[in-house]
Amino acid sequence: MANTKSAIKRIKISERNRIRNRIRLGKIKFYTKQFLKLLEENKIEEAKKVLPEVISAIDKAAQKGTLHKNTAARKKSKLMRLLNQKLSANLSS
């Protein structure tokens, strides 16, 4: 247990931040799963509509410090790469 006033305050702050971070990461996870599911079902037009929401959630988390900027860039790049692979596969077949 915390002994000082400042330590008690830090516990409160860290708990508040943990909840905020979990909400942000949960949004990213939700939209990412939705996007990947649409790609698997070959609903590319719908996936294109969901992608900006995923990218927005990732960018907000990176801006607020929940995600490192390189991690955010890697996640966005991966999603774009998957979409482009599906698009090129559909065009070639």
From Swiss-Prot:
GO terms for molecular function: small ribosomal subunit rRNA binding; structural constituent of ribosome. The gene is rpsT. Belongs to the bacterial ribosomal protein bS20 family. HAMAP family: Ribosomal_bS20. Binds directly to 16S ribosomal RNA. The lineage of its organism: Bacteria, Pseudomonadati, Dictyoglomota, Dictyoglomia, Dictyoglomales. This is Small ribosomal subunit protein bS20. It holds the Pfam family Ribosomal_S20p. One of its GO terms (biological process) is translation. PANTHER family: 30S RIBOSOMAL PROTEIN S20, SMALL RIBOSOMAL SUBUNIT PROTEIN BS20C. GO terms for cellular component: cytosol; small ribosomal subunit. Keywords: Ribonucleoprotein, Ribosomal protein, RNA-binding, rRNA-binding.
